[in-house]
Swiss-Prot record:
Protein name (database record): Spermidine/putrescine import ATP-binding protein PotA
Positions of ATP binding: G37, P38, S39, G40, C41, G42, K43, T44
Subunit annotation: The complex is composed of two ATP-binding proteins (PotA), two transmembrane proteins (PotB and PotC) and a solute-binding protein (PotD).
Gene source species: Aster yellows witches'-broom phytoplasma (strain AYWB)
Leader sequence residues: none
EC number: 7.6.2.11
Membrane topology: Peripheral membrane protein
Family, per entry: Belongs to the ABC transporter superfamily. Spermidine/putrescine importer (TC 3.A.1.11.1) family.
Chain positions covered by the region annotation Insert: 105-177
Job of this protein: Part of the ABC transporter complex PotABCD involved in spermidine/putrescine import. Responsible for energy coupling to the transport system.
SMART domains assigned: AAA (SM00382)
Pfam families membership: ABC_tran, TOBE_2
Encoding gene per record: potA
GO cellular component, one term: ATP-binding cassette (ABC) transporter complex
Length: 417
């Protein structure tokens, strides 16, 4: 996939407070990218800068290799769906979706081509005139002058005929108001069908549910066929079931439309369900960029491990390649490249720990609490050094003495930032 957007050394200062600290990010064409992080981490600020609603304090925003910082928001090939949708309460569903098309000049490309043709015609005519005068200056003989003049007039006549024919053909392609309205009707009904809003065309915004309002906002944003769609936590006001349905719908829309989506959320499930690439942020800085699988299975640091899913976070010491020491024991692992005796952070996911009979595992502990979570049990096991959180489908007795075990690949070693 081609790179569509590049953010280079982006910073933003609000009221003497540094909100963005040197953001560097590449977004590819037809990619679903999610900015994931806690409130105030700077993710919405990035969205607003891309959309043209804010300017960075320093840095560059490149779109297809060209800076767009001086391009007005409405002229960028980017549309935004805001958290509160920003729908027009005085317009019905149909007119909300049609709003962008009604502002659009359907003949703009034809007008541009007419201007291009005219410029080309004038330039060619001027070049012919220049050549004509140069030839006259070289040869002032009567017969030659007449021949040069006739040749010039013939070229000008041919050039003019070609220009007028092209202009006439382009003008014939212009559409009138009736044809424009027919196109609007066709496009609006198409996107209303895509978003599952058939039968609601004449309803006011107040008569819609939260999920329906969100669909209207997305249809309105998509109908102008932007190259990029920015979504600022659009699912935050929906109930759980509807939110899950919309996650799958959004991914399908993105995949089928070929539009690049940049989605902002603090919800890990949203990010992992929909994204090709997740950008984890904290305190105005990018902590890690990767696929949902990479972010979850190989967190770059303690913050990512804590923010993305539940974790057992442990401080340890790297003894050698593939050997790490924690909880008074040395364990085999799959990590290498650290200095000997380097202090490290370790994460072991709750689902990667198994409970076994005493004497059969790596660490002994006592079952301290058991909570049923629907698809698994969440069990706290207190050991001599710490309490481990374990997710398992096997039920164990409270206060029972057991062992826990895990594999070398389940131990994720991280640098301390």
């Amino acid at each position: 996939m081609k790179t569509l957007i590049i953010l280079k050394d982006l910073t933003k200062v609000f009221d003497n407070q540094l909100i963005l600290r040197g953001i560097n990010l590449e977004i590819k064409q037809n990619e679903f990218v999610t900015l994931l992080g806690p409130s105030g981490c700077g993710k919405t600020t990035i969205l607003r800068i891309l959309g043209g609603f804010e300017n960075p304090s320093s840095g560059e925003v490149l779109f297809q290799g060209k800076s767009i910082l001086n391009v007005a928001a409405h002229k960028r090939p980017i549309n935004t769906v805001f958290q509160k949708y920003a729908l027009f309460p005085h317009l019905n569903v149909f007119e909300n979706v049609a709003f962008g098309l009604r502002l659009k000049d359907f003949n703009s490309k034809i007008k541009d081509n007419l201007d291009i043709n005219e410029t080309h015609y004038k330039t060619s005519k001027a070049n012919l005139s220049k050549t004509f005068h140069q030839e006259l200056t070289k040869d002032l003989a009567q017969e030659k002058t007449t021949q040069i003049t006739n040749n010039f007039n013939n070229q000008i006549e041919a050039l003019t005929k070609d220009f007028e024919a092209k202009q006439t053909a382009l003008k014939c392609k212009k559409i009138n108001k009736k044809e424009q309205e027919e196109q609007i009707q066709k496009e609006v009904l198409k996107y209303i069908k895509i978003m599952g809003l058939q039968g609601l065309e004449k309803r006011t915004i107040e008569q819609l549910s939260g999920g329906q309002q969100q669909r209207v906002a997305i249809a309105r944003a998509l109908i102008n066929k932007p190259q990029v769609l920015l979504l600022d936590e659009p699912l935050s006001n929906l109930d759980l079931k509807l939110k899950q349905e919309m996650q799958y719908e959004l991914k399908e829309i993105q995949k089928n439309s070929g539009i690049t989506f940049l989605f902002v959320t603090h919800d890990q499930e949203e990010a992992f369900t929909m994204s090709d690439k997740v950008v984890v942020m904290n305190n105005g800085e990018i902590q890690q960029i990767g696929s949902p699988e990479d972010i979850y299975n190989e967190p770059a640091n303690r913050f990512v491990a804590q923010f993305v899913g539940e974790s057992n976070l442990i401080k340890g010491v790297m003894k050698d390649d593939f050997l790490v020491h924690f909880d008074n024991q040395t364990f085999n692992c799959v990590d290498k490249g650290f200095r000997k005796e380097e202090n490290v952070d370790i994460v072991i996911r709750p689902e990667d720990i198994d409970i076994v009979y005493q004497g059969k595992g790596l660490i002994t502990g006592i079952v301290q609490s058991i909570i049923f979570k629907g698809v698994h049990w969440e069990i706290d096991v207190k050991t001599a050094q710490r309490t481990y959180i374990i997710h398992t489908t096997d039920h164990v007795e409270l206060n029972k003495k057991i062992d826990i075990t895990f594999n070398p690949e389940d131990i994720h070693v991280m640098e301390i930032w």
